[in-house]
């Protein structure tokens, strides 16, 4: 298909997220153009290659249950500026016993110290090649 819908984990009646093979299509049906949405769409297309079931959670863009992995798209991540968001992401991940969080960025590689969960920021082009 050209358009993909996926739901929130354990909430079948929740709003679905929409992704597409064609970036222009999403721009045509949206009133606002947001780089983060286009960046998340790029990440989605990479995940689609793995043919795994994808969900989303509050503050977590992609949750792959079978890998116990949360993926968050933050193009311009900065630990100091995003500390409150990171706390929310960690809280949501720990509630589901997620073992690893990957924060996909445009320019940052960084291992974040956390005793409860493995957190890593990875530059998109490196992540896409893994």
Segments (PLM) and residue ranges:
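Conserved catalytic cores of phosphodiester-cleaving nucleases, focusing on short active-site segments
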Residues: 43, 47, 60-91, 101
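Domain-level recognition of nuclease-like catalytic cores that cleave nucleotide substrates
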Residues: 108-130
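Hydrophobic/aromatic beta-strand patches that form the interior of the parallel beta-sheet core
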Residues: 19, 71, 102-104, 120-122
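Short glycine-/acidic-enriched loop or helix-start segments at secondary-structure transitions
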Residues: 30, 82-83, 112-114
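Short, polar loop motifs at secondary-structure junctions
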Residues: 59-61, 104-111
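Accessory nucleic acid-recognition modules appended to NTPase machines
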Residues: 1-68
């Amino acid at each position: 298909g050209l358009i993909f819908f996926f739901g929130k984990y354990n909430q079948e009646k929740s709003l679905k997220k929409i992704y597409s093979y064609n970036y222009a299509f999403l721009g045509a049906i949206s009133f606002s153009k947001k780089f983060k949405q286009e960046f998340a769409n790029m990440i989605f297309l990479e995940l689609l290659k793995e043919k795994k079931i994808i969900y989303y959670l509050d503050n977590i863009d992609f949750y792959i249950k079978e890998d116990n992995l949360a993926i968050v798209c933050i193009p311009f991540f900065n630990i100091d500026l995003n500390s409150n968001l990171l706390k929310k992401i960690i809280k949501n991940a720990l509630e589901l016993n997620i073992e690893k969080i990957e924060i996909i960025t445009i320019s940052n590689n960084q291992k974040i110290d956390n005793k409860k969960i493995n957190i890593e920021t990875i530059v998109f082009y490196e992540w896409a090649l893994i």
